[in-house]
């Protein structure tokens, strides 16, 4: 019993050398079965015939033995060491089968009898492949997995094939995307270049604008249109209403270069339309004639003006019925008579100095009872 316990202790002490043993020196499956039988027969204690674990046997041996150091024999080490190594390998194979059943992976093991040596090798390769897949999916496709005794896993060839397909697909997709990007850049550069050429051709220079403004002013005056007529005609024809000030500043080259470039084509179209319709009444002539609906300057005859002046001396501010009757008698419009009286009163105010009277006002209004009250002239009523 002491010899068995000492052998067990030596077994636990030499665990590190057993773990790092070379996989190439493993024996066949039949020797593993004999070793397992031998281990079970050696490790069976008086506990209902069940084999105990290594740790439990070591603890039992320590509890039953004395504190003296155990003696070891080279013969016992030679007999037990292969047995323990074979038992550890058998436990590793069973753990691999359990790991395979718990965590299935992409690589499938080879089909066949699992009781032979080939089955053990396929199981080991499956274990290594599953470790590679658990560490990272890229390892499964990037490089083949080598197993015990230098054998290549059957699934590694398929992984290499998938790697090639993936690379070819990526290369094809990358080339296709690169071609699309290059074509898009080429089209963008062509459009940009065409836009630049087009803008360079359409953009006039400062000399062109100056020459066009001078010609436009001469032709406008020759055709008989004012600057206000041109601005109104542009608004009616093209939808852009421009004021007289804008047209004047264009002719004087006082607008910005950008605004001059925008206004030049519109004025050029208006000139072409005006030249083509010169000598015949067209829509431009009608629009220019309408203008801003300014009223004509009324010219009053001398006889009519004298009658209005005599009436103003009598009543500088007539009422609405008096204006209507006077307009009918003189054959004038009511609005013309009203405006004339307004202008005449404003003229009278300008002629009267502040706080004084007009020289000779006594002679003018002396015999008249219709003296304007604002002159302050007192006359006796006859």
Curated annotation (Swiss-Prot):
Residues 293-352 bind DNA. Residues 165-178 have a biased composition (Basic and acidic residues). GO terms for molecular function: DNA-binding transcription factor activity, RNA polymerase II-specific; RNA polymerase II cis-regulatory region sequence-specific DNA binding. Transmembrane segments: none annotated. Residues 69-136, 150-206, 348-382 are annotated as: Disordered. One of its GO terms (biological process) is brain development. InterPro entries: HD, Homeobox_CS, Homeodomain-like_sf, Lambda_DNA-bd_dom_sf, POU, POU_dom, POU_domain_TF, TF_POU_3. It is found in: Nucleus. One of its GO terms (cellular component) is nucleus. Residues 201-275 form the POU-specific domain. SUPFAM superfamilies: Homeodomain-like, lambda repressor-like DNA-binding domains. Expressed in the developing brain and spinal cord. Also found in a restricted region of the auditory vesicle during development. In the adult, expression is restricted to the brain. Keywords: Developmental protein, DNA-binding, Homeobox, Nucleus, Transcription, Transcription regulation. Residues 179-194 have a biased composition (Low complexity). Residues 122-136 have a biased composition (Polar residues). Its main location: nucleus. SMART domains: HOX (SM00389), POU (SM00352). Belongs to the POU transcription factor family. Class-3 subfamily. Transcription factor that may be implicated in patterning of the central nervous system during early development. This is POU domain, class 3, transcription factor 2-A. It comes from Xenopus laevis.
């Amino acid at each position: 019993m002491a010899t068995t316990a000492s052998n067990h202790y030596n077994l636990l002490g030499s665990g590190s050398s057993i773990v790092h043993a070379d996989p190439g020196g493993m024996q066949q499956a039949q020797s593993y079965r004999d070793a397992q039988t031998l281990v079970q027969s050696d490790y069976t204690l008086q506990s209902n015939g069940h084999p105990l674990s290594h740790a439990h046997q070591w603890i039992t041996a320590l509890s039953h033995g004395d504190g003296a150091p155990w003696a070891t024999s080279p013969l016992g080490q030679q007999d037990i060491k292969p047995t323990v190594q074979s038992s550890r390998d058998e436990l590793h194979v069973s753990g691999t089968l359990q790991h395979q059943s718990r965590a299935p992976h992409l690589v499938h093991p080879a089909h066949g009898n699992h009781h032979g040596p080939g089955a053990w090798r396929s199981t080991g390769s499956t274990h290594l492949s599953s470790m590679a897949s658990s560490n990272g999916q890229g390892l499964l496709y990037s490089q083949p997995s080598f197993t015990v005794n230098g054998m290549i896993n059957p699934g590694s060839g398929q992984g290499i094939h998938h790697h090639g397909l993936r690379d070819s697909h990526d290369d094809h997709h990358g080339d296709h995307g690169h071609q699309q990007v290059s074509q898009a850049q080429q089209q963008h550069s062509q459009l940009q270049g065409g836009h630049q050429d087009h803008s360079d051709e359409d953009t006039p220079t400062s000399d062109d604008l100056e020459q066009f403004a001078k010609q436009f002013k001469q032709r406008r005056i020759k055709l008989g249109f004012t600057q206000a007529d041109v601005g109104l005609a542009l608004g009616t024809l093209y939808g852009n209403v421009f004021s007289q000030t804008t047209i004047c500043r264009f002719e004087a080259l006082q607008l910005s270069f950008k605004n001059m470039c925008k206004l030049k084509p519109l004025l050029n179209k208006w000139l072409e339309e005006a030249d083509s319709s010169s000598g015949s009444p067209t829509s431009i002539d009608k629009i220019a004639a309408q203008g801003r609906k300014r009223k004509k300057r009324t010219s009053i005859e001398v006889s009519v003006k004298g009658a209005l002046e005599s009436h103003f001396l009598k009543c500088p501010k007539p009422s609405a019925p008096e204006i209507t009757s006077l307009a009918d008698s003189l054959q004038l419009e009511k609005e013309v008579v009203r405006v004339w009286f307004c202008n005449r009163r404003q003229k009278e105010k300008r002629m009267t100095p502040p706080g004084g009277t007009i020289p000779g006002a006594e002679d003018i209004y002396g015999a008249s009872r219709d003296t304007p009250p604002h002159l302050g002239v007192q006359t006796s009523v006859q």
